[in-house]
Amino acid sequence: MQTIYTKITDIKGNLITVEAEGARLGELAEIERVDGRSSYASVLRFDAKKVTLQVFGGTSGLSTGDRVVFLGRSMEVTYGESLIGRRLNGVGKPIDGEGECFGDPIEISTPTFNPVCRVVPRDMVRTNIPMIDVFNCLVKSQKIPIFSSSGEKHNALLMRIAAQTDADIVIIGGMGLTFVDYSFFVEESKRLGFADKSVMFIHKAVDAPVECVLIPDMALACAEKFAVDQNKNVLVLLTDMTAFADALKEIAITMDQIPANRGYPGSLYSDLALRYEKAVDIAQGGSITLISVTTMPGDDITHPVPDNTGFITEGQFDLKNNCIDPFGSLSRLKQLVIGKVTREDHGDLANALIRLYADSRKANERMSMGFKLSNWDKKLLAFAELFETRLMSLEVNIPLEEALDIGWKILAQSFHSEEVGIKEQLINKYWPKSCLHR
């Protein structure tokens, strides 16, 4: 039997305080308003006989005479095949105008996967983006952020990854989206043809902060069920984790919590880690691979959100000047697949390309300072132009093997074979035949 409480003693922002007993942290409650409408709230704090709840959708229209019913469970989301191709909001309700989703309700506040059932990742997730596939491979079950500078088209990059990945299901969690961003997600998913294998959980900038905090939990809870129950390889794309952290900060300030670095709550690290640690490769099952976008306010990588994220994740993609910067990017798991599930020349070729491109940056500095360029400097600058056009550009969309072949061609067009520092047996096998005399 459910107990109905009517003593709402305080309404502050999106929070209400109720005189009640027996509630637990994270428990869901239904608020029955005097005008007949209802809304949901989640328990954030309890003290003696007072319980503080965060109201989904805000407290506008609430009165102290409304009734609060604790439901004895945490927030749930519908899981099932009917979820594929749908778009839902921050409380799990459809927003695509196609009716209700049918399936089983699952709790979203679940612990991370049992470490005993995890396996060491050994498979590559292909994206057909050379700066990822060649130089910083995305590995199945990896958790990795995209650190985005101001003005970068990170959402367009996410949509390309979603369209070109070989994952079975793509789950997108959008937080703090403008209407333009949301429309872009919908239109691109249809144009690129992956809408029928995707699920979108969307929080718009005008929605309540608590709904923003729920988006990653809903996306990851559904991903885990698809991976465990159906052995699916799921790619989860979250944007923007800075908006997620800002929502946590807003809630913490409303609750009068003592702020930590730059006003963010002291629990920021654990709040981020709790979500990222959901990435998993399951023995005898599927997998969850997690890519998130973390925008850097003022391009400051020491900002608390990217700073904490870097300690949790397994590398990062640095999106800068409309390309993935090879020097700021890192995949800590790439050694598990390079040369093992990819071609034997992958590692040596990638290292040579990056080394020569780094040298070309120095040659470019010498040129900008007016120094006389050597023949080697001129070769490096010619190589850099080819490298940036044919491999670094985000417009390039080619499979890994073709990207490796292009890498060899770029080297052959710019250097003699003995100048690139690659093993002779690989030179003999992969150096373009028409350029063997070089």
UniProtKB/Swiss-Prot annotation:
InterPro entries: ATP-synt_VA_C, ATPase_F1/V1/A1_a/bsu_N, ATPase_F1/V1/A1_a/bsu_nucl-bd, P-loop_NTPase, V-ATPase_su_B/beta. Keywords: ATP synthesis, Hydrogen ion transport, Ion transport, Transport. GO terms for molecular function: ATP binding; proton-transporting ATP synthase activity, rotational mechanism. Pfam families: ATP-synt_ab, ATP-synt_ab_N, ATP-synt_VA_C. Disulfide bonds: none annotated. It comes from the Bacteria. GO terms for biological process: proton motive force-driven plasma membrane ATP synthesis. Belongs to the ATPase alpha/beta chains family. Produces ATP from ADP in the presence of a proton gradient across the membrane. The V-type beta chain is a regulatory subunit. NCBIfam families: PRK02118.1 (NF002555), PRK04196.1 (NF003235). This is V-type ATP synthase beta chain.
